[in-house]
Every structure is written in structure tokens, then in C-alpha cells.
Amino acid sequence: VPECRYPKQRGKNTIIKLMSRFRTFIRWAIKNKYMSHYPFVEYEMGTAIFGTPYYLTKDERNTLYKAKFPNNPALEVQRDIFIFQSFIGCRIGDLMKMTKTNIINGAIEYIPRKTKEGRPVTVRVPLSPTAKEIIAKYPDVPGNKLLPFISEQKYNKAIKKMIQLAGIDRVVTTINTITREEEKHPIWEVASSHMARRNLIGNLYREVQDPNLIAKIS
């Protein structure tokens, strides 16, 4: 029997993002004379609202890296990948495509997927001692993959579980994407692969406060 899934309610930010893309397409169609009527004349797009970015502090990151999960060794593998991603700051889609060939002269080099169709930019991130240590743990991953990746969905579930089991339960404030109301959650409950990017950017900004430098490696 096919699985029955009901559509989820979309948040205001998601609707704004989708409608913005649709508006861009409509403008292209009008410019190329595929249509003449512009349907967005009286449509108010609205403004996306985001809460304060949350991320693991250096101490929390180190606590997670040292945590042991004797009853779930597979979780320790995914923990290593999450810590590695927290040092590299790349998006999950870019991370999962990395192989050993992305290691060049003590750094990770890659072209972010989001820049490939516009102006391709090569990002170079020096490997920290911890990042090198993690890579050394997994020398023979099938397909020459950089690390033993699993699906993004399973990875996100593993991230929540590992942070919870490590006892990292600091409460953070988020914005509900549907109601736009403020909510409080333990950080493990709202953690995901995208938080790994914020782990790098947030901690780095505390030290250097140089947006240009941070942009070059994220």
C-alpha cells in the first residue's frame, strides 16, 4: 500500500522564498515576450523574519567530540562527520560530494554548489588538527569518499540524538515558521546539518569579526 502523506503547512518565509522565485520567472517571461501581464502589481511579498542564529559554542563542540556512545558506535561516526563539518563550514550537499581529492596541501578545497551556475568560486579551508584527526580515522571509505556519509535525513536525526546524549541541552530562542511566534527549545531539539555552518561562522566571528574573511571560507 503506498504511503499516504499529507501536505505540511508552509511557513511565511518559505512562501516568500517560493513567490520570489516565481516573480523572477514571470519577469523573465515578460522580458522575453512570452507574456505581457505582470500579476505581481498589487501583490505584497512581505518580509522574511529570522530569529537569532544559534550554534554550538567551542566548549559544547569539544564536549560533543569527546562524548562516548558505547551502545551506538554508528552514532560516533556521524558525530565525527558533524564535528568535521563544524570546522569546514560547508553546506551538507557540498560535504557529501567530497572525496579524498578535495584535500589539497593541508586544506579542503571545493566549489560550493550554489556558485557553480553563477560565478564559480573555489573555497579553501585549512584543516585544523581535529579535522585531520577525523579524516585519519576513515582512510578507506568506499568510492574514495572523504567520510562515511549517510542520507541527509538520517544524518539530521543523528545530529539531534548525539547532542542530546552528550548532555548539551542549553535552551535557545527560535521563531516558529508558521506562527512567527517566539519559542524556546533545548538546542539538540532544533539542531541540524545547517547548524554546523553556524558553528564555524558564529565562533569565528566572535574571534575575528571580519565578515570578508568569514565569507571566504564559508
PLM ranges: what are they?
Residues 26-38, 85-107:
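Short, charged phosphate-coordinating catalytic segments
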Residues 61, 77-79, 156, 194-198, ...:
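Short, leucine-enriched amphipathic alpha-helices that occur as contiguous helical runs
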